[in-house]
């Protein structure tokens, strides 16, 4: 897997990193896309999990001040949807926590909080490695005739994807009445198709000014 292999070489590409980055990786259960903004000691990160088959789309938003996690905001788009929110003070102590689903609010246990903090640290470490390794997420609308993509930034490009990835996109496109959205990763080691879907990825993609 391209993203996994890049962890081995991430540290050699750590100069002049941009403040706003998009990256991602594939795991067993689905694709994870990550948007991140670094401003001084502050880090704002959004991770979007899209399942391959079963499961629910999930967004996880985190904020750090230095090494201290200050916010966890998780939305699980199940039926009914679930929101999990926790805030921490500048010493790292918990100041607010809540789980809400179908109008019912519940407190979180200490074990649950510890698990969410662990997952936050885990995704931060993965994001650090992908960012330093310059693994870049690109996404946009596929144009089957030209095999090009109009990215969410408005550029029309031809992704450097292998024939297997192109064939997968074309199969999905043949079953859709609209141009499918595609997401892929680019790095010095090559490109990897990450996700294909009917939904419009650009409609909700974060941008640097408002993130």
What feature does the model see in each segment?
Residues 172-192:
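Flexible glycine-rich surface loops and low-complexity tracts that mediate binding to linear polymers
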Residues 187-211:
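OB-fold/S1-family single-stranded nucleic acid-binding modules
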């Amino acid at each position: 897997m391209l993203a996994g292999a890049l962890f081995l070489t991430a540290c050699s590409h750590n100069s002049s990193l941009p403040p706003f980055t998009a990256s991602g990786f594939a795991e067993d259960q689905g694709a994870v896309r990550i948007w991140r903004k670094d401003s001084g000691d502050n880090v704002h990160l959004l991770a979007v999990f899209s399942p391959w088959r079963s499961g629910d789309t999930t967004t996880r938003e985190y904020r750090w001040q230095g090494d201290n996690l200050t916010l966890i905001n998780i939305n699980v788009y199940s039926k009914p949807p679930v929101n999990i929110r926790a805030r921490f003070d500048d010493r790292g102590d918990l100041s607010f926590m809540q789980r809400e689903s179908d109008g019912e609010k519940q407190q979180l246990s200490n074990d649950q909080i510890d698990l969410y903090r662990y997952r936050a640290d885990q995704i931060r470490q993965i994001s650090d490695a992908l960012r330093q390794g310059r693994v870049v997420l690109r996404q946009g609308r596929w144009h089957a005739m030209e095999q090009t993509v109009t990215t969410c930034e408005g550029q029309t490009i031809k992704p450097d994807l292998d024939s297997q990835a192109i064939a997968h996109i074309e199969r999905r496109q043949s079953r859709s009445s609209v141009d499918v959205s595609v997401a892929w990763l680019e790095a010095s080691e090559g490109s990897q198709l990450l996700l294909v879907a009917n939904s419009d990825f650009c409609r909700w993609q974060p941008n640097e000014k408002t993130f």
